[in-house]
UniProtKB/Swiss-Prot annotation:
Substrate binds at N274, G331, I332, M333. Pathway: Carbohydrate metabolism; tricarboxylic acid cycle; succinate from succinyl-CoA (ligase route): step 1/1. Residues 9-254 form the ATP-grasp domain. GO terms for cellular component: cytosol; succinate-CoA ligase complex. ATP binds at K46, G53, R54, G55, E109, A112, E117. Its EC number is 6.2.1.5. Gene3D superfamilies: ATP-grasp fold, A domain (3.30.1490.20), ATP-grasp fold, B domain (3.30.470.20), Succinyl-CoA synthetase domains (3.40.50.261). Binds 1 Mg(2+) ion per subunit. It comes from Bartonella tribocorum (strain CIP 105476 / IBS 506). GO terms for molecular function: ATP binding; magnesium ion binding; succinate-CoA ligase (ADP-forming) activity; succinate-CoA ligase (GDP-forming) activity. Mg(2+) binds at N209, D223. This is Succinate--CoA ligase [ADP-forming] subunit beta. It catalyses: succinate + ATP + CoA = succinyl-CoA + ADP + phosphate; GTP + succinate + CoA = succinyl-CoA + GDP + phosphate. HAMAP family: Succ_CoA_beta.
Length: 398
């Protein structure tokens, strides 16, 4: 689960991280009211959407010469003018896709006198089985670009979970970020704080880009991105309250209600598969034969008829879907249950696109019989290769 920048900053501030004064606003009236309470004279107006690249983004409704989704203002009047221009508009960034995201809230905060911009993140390093700091002196830009062009400028430090962040760890991080004097003292306080927040709140990613050294020599968290482990949200009701459903795909929200692993993609062939590995293989072979998957959908190993029906409805709710491939290898999951769910769903929502079903494993003959006896226009397939070729051909011929 992702949260907005202003929510991430508030959370980190509760642990003691240094942030600027700021307030989230939802209207022009709120913007004017709260901007007057900030010290100024420099303000930053930030679009709040779940996507990066906001500063370089473009609003669909504005001209190509308009400013992006993060703007500086020299007065309260400029703040209000920017809010009026940005609020309710659709911001397109490299992470939103061409459809963009509507800006329903803005974050207004004090400006900062920046001396240097740094990069810092915490993540789970699966190669060593530890939480690791990833830092760089090249902040304020895409870390992927830094990794590609100047990988030597990235320093990774796995943390021993039994010891936590030690003074030696802090020293190594400070050295990597070239922190001195007041900034070094701030860093020695900040690193353990961030690690504690990451662990206690079950984060999957904590990214600060940039972490700045101000002209007065102190550190400040200038931007923050936080993601949480969905599997741990049951023990964090306070975090769940921060969820912004308007930022999520409605189909993914519906899938989560049925405990389905669903990710919307941009292709035309809907996929319903059991098992993440088989789901990825299914998407790969669809691409191999010249088409694109419309989604990743894993119904899991013990799905019921109702769960399968819900999964089918979610797939058919996507207007981009021109064909559906059901690929089931029954182990724990029984093929007859899948077949009953597919038949029930098709009868309920109708079938307006080609449907290919490949079943193998437990109760496969019963499953095939259920589909054959249903009278539905379903294309059977013998194996994965056969299934992929048939659905791609059906979609291209439609």
């Amino acid at each position: 689960m992702n949260i907005h920048e202003y929510q991430a900053k508030r959370l980190l501030h509760e642990y003691g991280a240094p942030i600027a004064n700021g307030v989230a606003v939802y209207s022009i009236e709120q913007a004017e009211k709260w901007a007057k309470k900030l010290p100024g004279p420099l303000y930053v107006v930030k679009s709040q959407i779940h996507a990066g690249g906001r500063g370089k983004g473009q609003f669909k409704e504005l001209g190509p010469d308009a400013k992006g989704g993060v703007r500086l203002a020299q007065s309260v009047e400029e703040v209000v003018a920017n809010v009026q221009e940005m609020l309710g508009k659709t911001l397109v960034t490299k992470q939103t896709g061409p459809e963009g995201k509507q800006v329903n809230r803005l974050y207004i905060e004090d400006g900062a006198d920046i001396e240097r911009e740094l990069y810092l993140s915490l993540l789970v390093d699966r190669s060593v089985g530890r939480i690791a700091f990833v830092v760089s002196t090249e902040g304020g830009m895409d870390i992927e670009t830094v990794a590609e062009e100047t990988p030597e400028k990235i320093f990774t430090l796995p943390i021993d979970v039994t010891e936590g962040v030690t003074s030696a760890d802090c020293a190594r991080l400070c050295d990597a970020l070239e922190l001195h004097d007041s900034a070094r003292e701030d860093g020695e306080k900040l690193f353990p704080i961030l690690y504690k927040a990451f662990c206690e709140k079950d984060m999957s990613l904590l990214e600060i880009n940039p972490l700045i050294v101000m002209k007065d020599g102190h550190l400040r968290v200038l931007d923050a991105k936080v993601s949480f482990d969905n599997n741990a949200l049951f023990r964090h009701p306070d975090i769940l309250e921060l969820r912004d459903l308007s930022e999520e795909d409605p189909k993914e929200i519906e899938a989560s209600k049925h405990d389905l692993a669903y990710v919307a993609l941009e292709g035309t062939i809907g996929c319903m598969v059991n098992g993440a590995g088989l789901a990825m293989a299914t998407m790969d072979i669809i691409k191999l034969y010249g088409a694109e998957p419309a989604n990743f959908l894993d119904v899991g190993g013990g799905a019921s008829k109702e769960k399968v029906t819900a999964a089918f409805k979610i797939i058919t709710a996507d207007p981009n879907v021109k064909g559906i491939l059901v690929n089931i290898f029954g182990g724990i999951m029984r093929c007859d249950v899948i077949a009953e769910g597919v038949v029930a769903a098709v009868r309920e929502v109708g079938l307006k696109v080609p449907l290919v079903v490949r079943l193998e494993g437990t109760n496969v003959e019963q499953g095939k019989a259920i589909i054959n006896d249903s009278g539905l226009n379903v294309i059977p397939a013998d194996d994965l290769d056969d299934a992929a070729q048939k659905i791609v051909a059906a979609v291209k011929g439609a």
